[in-house]
Design a protein with these regions (language model features):
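Short, functional N-terminal and low-complexity linear motifs
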Residues: 5-11, 57-61, 89
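Short, flexible active-site loop motifs that bind/organize anionic cofactors or intermediates
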Residues: 2, 61, 77
Length: 92
């Protein structure tokens, strides 16, 4: 099991975070504070994301946050899933 941070909680980030969690990894999912409503929606579901396609299941994400330091704390692997047009905001 690896401790993994997924940065950007859009469709791709959520799918990746869920897949990794279902595979037994310890996953933190982060997005920018301006996307707090997305983060809060996942939190209201008990930090769960449901996958329904080739991979199915309900994954529990250990940490869902808008705090980048918290998401990266102890991460062995970091995935950055923001689309190219949205990446600049992560570096401002």
């Amino acid at each position: 099991m690896k401790k993994i941070a997924v940065l950007s909680a859009g469709n791709g980030g959520q799918a990746l975070a869920a897949d990794l969690a279902l595979r037994g990894h310890d996953v933190a999912l982060y997005d920018l504070p301006r996307f707090a409503p997305v983060i809060e929606a996942i939190r209201r579901r008990g930090n769960t994301i449901e996958l329904q396609n080739k991979i199915t299941g309900t994954a529990t994400i250990r940490l869902v946050t808008t705090d980048i330091a918290e998401a990266l704390d102890g991460a062995e692997v970091v995935y950055f899933t923001a689309p190219s047009y949205g990446q600049k905001a992560f570096f401002d």
